[in-house]
């Protein structure tokens, strides 16, 4: 994975069932529903807990 993140450990930052999106204009993850658009996310992806 490329990019710099502000996470200080490897715990998944979102609730179960949500996914982590890294906005193009931010270095901190936001959580969103897996059905939400990923157009504003780095790599156009929202990372699920399974893929974290």
From Swiss-Prot:
Disulfide partners: 14-31, 19-41, 21-46
GO cellular component, one term: extracellular region
UniProt key word Secreted: yes
Molecular function terms from GO: ion channel regulator activity; toxin activity
UniProt keyword list: Disulfide bond, Ion channel impairing toxin, Neurotoxin, Secreted, Toxin
Propeptide residues, chain positions: 1-6
Compartmental location: Secreted
Top-level division of the source organism's lineage: Eukaryota
Known tissue expression: Expressed by the venom duct.
Function recorded in the entry: Probable neurotoxin with unknown target. Possibly targets ion channels.
Domain notes: The cysteine framework is IX (C-C-C-C-C-C).
UniProt name for this protein: Conotoxin Cal9.2b
Organism: Californiconus californicus
């Amino acid at each position: 994975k490329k990019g710099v993140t502000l996470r200080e450990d490897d715990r998944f930052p979102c609730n179960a069932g949500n996914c982590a999106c890294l906005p193009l204009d931010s270095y901190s993850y936001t959580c969103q529903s897996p059905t939400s658009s990923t157009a504003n996310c780095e790599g156009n992806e929202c990372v699920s807990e399974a893929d974290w």
